[in-house]
């Protein structure tokens, strides 16, 4: 196991891969560096003296400016490093030197072919409430249906939420779009849409967003219109489960996979282990004709030009500029400083500034060209790497990936989290300590890249196989625990 890593040849800091004691002498690229204080795991230390006001370089890019003279061997963190991010910026499209990944041999998994041509990796029956007022009824329906679930139906899930009424303008529109996206999701073999009757987003309104449906697959129940909603729901659920049970897994080309990519509870190893592993995975899937979705726009701030210059054309570049600046304007409108993002857990794990976090976060995008830029709740329609507008919040962003069509989400974490999303959510640990302590949460240990000297390419191949296995029916830890979460982006007034 290495003591440290210098990520890029131009960096003036290195990252401790394990705790390094004060007075330890390390050979960094042929130069002896002696630490002048203890360096925690995942944190940065200086390998070339940095003067006050000079940039601190990591990943080959600036992550902020020194707030004091920092000698060789010193710890670099919030006490002596400050962000260099500002407000809205002007950007220039500079695509030279970027090319897409080369096509590779196809891969396959066992999935569910739907009548509309989409492919699911689960065959579940979903209950989608139009409004939070019927959440308790939805959960009761879920419990009854689970007790009667036939063979061939993976699970019955009620996706409760607090919205659907007392919302205005964009919030109400977003709720309707997200619910419609879920109703049309291929992981759902069948869906019961459960309404109250007097809400803003009542069933008749929502139908305009859902579009044409197969009445065997999607059924509607407005509970104010019936005498006994439980009896009516049980009848409808039995019909829906019988329909869903007719689908069987069959061999499907991996080009049909759409995988969301998200990180949360990041630490100083996120950009060294788990995120680059996911990035290589993304390149592998794209090379086989598949699709990946990168979101959490605020965690692109400071690294956005990397993604902009990888846009396949000028139109996508302009869309990415709007993606970034629209989110910055959202922050400004609400009086939030753009750069105040790293959480206490991020900082404890070694991430200092938003640039530091973002440069690690965008490692998940790999090296392929950006082929699509999506608005929040917009379904993906272009194969390859897509950027999706959504905030950094774990539940909101992961739900957004699912709503845009992801059949699965890859979630990297250095601190750990038990949450789930509407689709299988693969938890990838950045460090082996987390993987060992939280084996009931973690599905893949990318920390072995550090502790076991596992080559990054081998880790990515293992992850690719795990994704195929999960797509073929293997349950992730959150599914085993029975976790299924949903969160919708809220920005405005609640009436």
Which residues does each predicted region cover?
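Metallocofactor- and cofactor-centric catalytic cores in central/energy metabolism, strongly enriched
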Residues: 1-408, 415-418, 423-495
């Amino acid at each position: 196991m290495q003591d440290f890593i210098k990520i890029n040849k131009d960096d003036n800091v290195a990252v401790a891969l394990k705790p390094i004691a004060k007075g330890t002498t390390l050979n960094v690229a042929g130069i002896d560096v002696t630490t002048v204080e203890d360096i925690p795991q995942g944190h940065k230390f200086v390998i070339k003296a940095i003067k006050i006001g000079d940039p601190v370089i990591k990943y080959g890019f600036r992550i902020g400016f020194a707030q004091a003279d920092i000698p060789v061997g010193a710890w670099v963190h919030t006490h002596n490093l400050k962000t260099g991010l500002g407000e809205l910026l002007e950007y220039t499209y500079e695509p030279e030197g970027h090319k897409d990944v080369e096509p590779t041999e196809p891969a396959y998994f066992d999935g569910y072919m739907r009548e509309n041509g989409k492919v699911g990796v689960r065959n579940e029956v979903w209950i989608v409430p139009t409004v939070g007022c019927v959440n308790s009824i939805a959960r009761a329906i879920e419990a009854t249906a689970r007790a009667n679930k036939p063979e061939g139906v993976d699970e019955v899930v009620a996706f409760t939420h607090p919205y659907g009424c007392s919302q205005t303008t964009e919030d109400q529109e977003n709720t309707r779009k997200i619910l419609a996206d879920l109703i049309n999701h291929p992981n759902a073999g069948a869906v019961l849409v459960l309404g109250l009757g007097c809400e803003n987003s009542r069933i008749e309104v929502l139908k305009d967003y859902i579009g044409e449906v197969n009445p065997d697959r999607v059924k509607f129940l407005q509970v104010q219109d019936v005498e006994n909603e439980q009896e009516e729901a049980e009848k409808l659920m039995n019909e829906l489960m019988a329909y869903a049970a007719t689908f069987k897994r069959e061999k499907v080309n991996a080009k049909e996979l759409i995988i969301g990519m998200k990180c949360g509870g990041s630490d100083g190893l996120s950009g060294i282990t788990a995120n680059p592993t996911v990035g290589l995975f993304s390149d592998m899937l794209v090379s086989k004709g598949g699709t990946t979705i990168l979101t959490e726009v605020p965690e692109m701030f400071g690294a956005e030009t990397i993604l902009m210059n990888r846009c396949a054309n000028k139109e996508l570049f302009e869309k990415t500029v709007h993606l970034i600046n629209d989110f910055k304007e959202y922050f400004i409108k609400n009086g939030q400083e753009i750069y105040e993002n790293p959480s206490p857990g991020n900082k404890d794990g070694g991430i200092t500034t938003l640039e530091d976090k973002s440069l690690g976060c965008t490692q998940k995008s790999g090296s392929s060209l950006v082929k699509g830029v999506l608005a929040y709740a917009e379904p993906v329609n272009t194969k390859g790497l897509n950027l999706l507008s959504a905030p950094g919040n774990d539940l909101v962003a992961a739900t957004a990936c699912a709503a845009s069509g992801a059949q699965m989400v890859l979630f990297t974490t250095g601190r750990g989290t038990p949450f789930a999303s509407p689709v299988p959510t693969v938890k990838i640990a950045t460090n082996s300590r987390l993987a060992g302590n939280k084996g009931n949460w973690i599905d893949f240990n990318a920390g072995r890249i550090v502790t076991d000297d596992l080559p990054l390419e081998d880790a990515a191949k293992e992850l690719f196989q795990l994704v195929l296995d999960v797509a073929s029916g293997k349950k992730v830890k959150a599914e085993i625990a029975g976790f299924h979460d949903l969160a919708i982006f809220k920005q405005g007034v609640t009436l």
